[in-house]
């Protein structure tokens, strides 16, 4: 990539940050700990299924 070209990566990243940073009051609010707990639960279910299969 030549030093004269600007790929616009920084500008597009700034747009994504602005898009994902906006909070919608009507959006479903999920606690991050709940997501981790559900993922750990399903992981445990898969491990137990492999152990008993």
Curated annotation (Swiss-Prot):
InterPro entries: Preprot_translocase_SecG (IPR023531), SecG/Sec61-beta/Sbh (IPR016482). Residues 52-53 are extracellular. It holds the Pfam family Sec61_beta. GO terms for cellular component: plasma membrane. The chain crosses the membrane at residues 32-51. GO terms for biological process: protein transport. Keywords: Cell membrane, Membrane, Protein transport, Translocation, Transmembrane, Transmembrane helix, Transport. The keyword Transport applies. Belongs to the SEC61-beta family. Component of the protein translocase complex. Heterotrimer consisting of alpha (SecY), beta (SecG) and gamma (SecE) subunits. Can form oligomers of the heterotrimer. This is Preprotein translocase subunit SecG.
């Amino acid at each position: 990539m030549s030093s004269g070209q600007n790929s616009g990566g920084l500008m597009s990243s700034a747009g994504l940050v602005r898009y994902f940073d906006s909070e919608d009051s009507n959006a479903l609010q999920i606690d991050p700990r709940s997501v981790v707990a559900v993922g750990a639960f399903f992981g445990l279910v898969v491990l137990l299924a492999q152990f008993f299969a």
